[in-house]
Swiss-Prot record:
Gene that encodes the chain: pcm1
GO BP terms, alphabetized: methylation; protein modification process; protein repair
Chain's role: Catalyzes the methyl esterification of L-isoaspartyl residues in peptides and proteins that result from spontaneous decomposition of normal L-aspartyl and L-asparaginyl residues. It plays a role in the repair and/or degradation of damaged proteins.
Assigned keywords, A-Z: Cytoplasm, Methyltransferase, S-adenosyl-L-methionine, Transferase
Protein name: Protein-L-isoaspartate O-methyltransferase 1
Gene source species: Syntrophobacter fumaroxidans (strain DSM 10017 / MPOB)
Taxonomic lineage from the root: Bacteria, Pseudomonadati, Thermodesulfobacteriota, Syntrophobacteria, Syntrophobacterales
Length: 214
């Protein structure tokens, strides 16, 4: 039988620390969150592998390094209100919930949203709200957000998300075509929005009014 805690520890050391993930809070969150509970039973032994895994409905759970990179880029301190676009399995939301005060997560697929919510509730997370909606529209009723994380690729950054980012906030989003994207960090400041390229990635499509057509 696999010792999943040891598997997580090994994942953190060999995949995250070795590639420059240095935020201690991010590393501890990823040591703690039971990644194997967010994948199908048949894939549990692969849960900590260095690649994405299918979660059904043509969606995936991102590889651990990408989860860590995106999370670290938000520079969370613990007091933040976060918007996540693309709940998927719920794993990224769980990691964020370990590091921030509240997480508002949007998933357009009702089946995925239901399964993710069930898993998160079983694990006892009280600071995550999952909603079925078009993520490209954001969550206006709860805006502004200190941080926004988008877990799907978009041809351009949805304007509603930029509008809902608090001053001093940080947004991480994959931007590009359907085959490959660049991971972009947007920082909102008094002089406007600063964009930084964090490197090449490949995500499933962000479908919605301000993303790709379904």
């Amino acid at each position: 039988m696999i010792n999943f805690q040891k598997a997580r520890d090994r994942m953190v050391e060999t995949q995250l620390v070795s590639r420059g993930i240095h935020d201690r809070r991010v590393l501890e969150a990823m040591r703690k969150v039971p990644r194997h509970l967010f994948v199908d039973e048949a894939l549990k032994e692969q849960a900590h592998s260095d690649h994405p895994l299918p979660i059904g409905d043509k969606q995936t759970i991102s590889q651990p390094y990408i989860v860590a990179l995106m999370t670290q880029s938000l520079e969370l301190q613990g007091h933040e209100k976060i918007l996540e676009i693309g709940t998927g399995s719920g794993y990224q939301a769980a990691v964020l919930a370990e590091l921030a005060e509240r997480v508002f997560s949007i998933e357009r697929n009702p089946n995925l949203a239901y399964r993710a919510n069930q898993t998160l509730q079983k694990l006892g997370y009280k600071n995550i709200i999952v909603r079925v909606a078009d993520g490209t529209l954001g969550w206006p009723d709860e805006a502004p957000f200190d941080a926004i994380l988008v877990t799907a690729g978009t041809p351009k950054i949805p304007q509603p998300l930029l509008d809902q980012l608090a001053e001093g906030g940080r947004l991480v989003v994959p931007v590009g075509d359907r085959l490959a994207q660049e991971l972009v960090l947007v920082e909102s400041g008094p002089e406007g929005m600063k964009h930084t390229n964090l490197g090449g990635v490949r995500f499933v499509d962000l479908v919605g009014k301000w993303g790709w057509e379904g």
